[in-house]
């Protein structure tokens, strides 16, 4: 038996302690008298073994995290205890005691660390794209698959439309119509001219959203345009002149409040959103327009490529499924196959 493996009795004690800490009405223990009463809070941001927790009165507190807490991310609802003033005049950090059950969690697979959670308790993923650094339908489709798998509503936002001339606008409208036709909500906005921003604010109201998308598409600029001027501005970098790719500006996921009542989590940008932790069947189901045709192929094990009698390919040829989406579906499956052997190889070496 591994010396790090907990016995059943130890596991029961850990679980019992966790449940006890979820009771906010309990009395502080004598051996931690420098901490106040337990109360509810929400994680605003996580920094290593510390987290910023917002109390019910809106005040944020830097807290340590109990070692028994296996996972803590921005958006988590927690039970925490504030630090009291020590005799030496040094402020004692608070401590996160327990985490409430999540309604949802957005995860990102990592080739070396496995599946990594990004944010919790979100009910809307704002997929931000732009004509610069690149209008990538592949990245949009990856996030849409994640939304469908998590059962979280997506909102596609195309930023920087002020950079488009009439022909460019017509081209972009055609690309976005691919998503409108299959039921997705799409907004075209500009954080510079504020075109479309009022509709964007309405879509954010009453929601806990997360901004997702490749670097350089203007996620931070959009947030700065939406946040009240009293809030600190989020760092904004331009697209790199050398690579043409966006430079990462957000270093840790952080939750912000809007005056209209919505909450937004700004997360580090990603250039590619991996989905290799999902089964191929989940990817297929993640394309909503495919669902009416699944089960109608000639062969039960149809790969939806060049197999005779493929219902999906016939739908593409008939214009019922966008060819761009069908191609991205196969690109996602191919990228999964390329990533999995690397992950397996890394695990074998350990």
Swiss-Prot record:
Molecular function terms from GO: GTP binding; GTPase activity; metal ion binding; rRNA binding
Main localization of the protein described in the UniProt heading: cytoplasm
Record EC number: 3.6.1.-
Name of a matching Pfam family: RsgA_GTPase
Broad EC category: hydrolase
SUPFAM superfamilies, per database record: P-loop containing nucleoside triphosphate hydrolases
Keyword terms: Cytoplasm, GTP-binding, Hydrolase, Metal-binding, Nucleotide-binding, Ribosome biogenesis, RNA-binding, rRNA-binding, Zinc
Signal sequence interval, chain numbering: none
Binding residue positions for GTP: 159-162, 213-221
InterPro entries the UniProt entry points to: G_CP_dom, NA-bd_OB-fold, P-loop_NTPase, Ribosome_biogen_GTPase_RsgA, RsgA_GTPase_dom
Region (Disordered), start-end ranges: 1-35
Compositional bias ranges of the Polar residues kind: 1-17
Cofactor note: Binds 1 zinc ion per subunit.
Residues in CP-type G domain copies: 103-273
GO BP: any one term: ribosomal small subunit biogenesis
Annotated residues for binding of Zn(2+): 297, 302, 304, 310
Cell compartment(s), UniProt: Cytoplasm
One Gene Ontology cellular component annotation held by this UniProt entry: cytoplasm
Cofactor(s) required, per the database record: Zn(2+)
Known partners and oligomeric status: Monomer. Associates with 30S ribosomal subunit, binds 16S rRNA.
Family per record: Belongs to the TRAFAC class YlqF/YawG GTPase family. RsgA subfamily.
Function: One of several proteins that assist in the late maturation steps of the functional core of the 30S ribosomal subunit. Helps release RbfA from mature subunits. May play a role in the assembly of ribosomal proteins into the subunit. Circularly permuted GTPase that catalyzes slow GTP hydrolysis, GTPase activity is stimulated by the 30S ribosomal subunit.
Name under which the protein is recorded: Small ribosomal subunit biogenesis GTPase RsgA
Encoding gene (name): rsgA
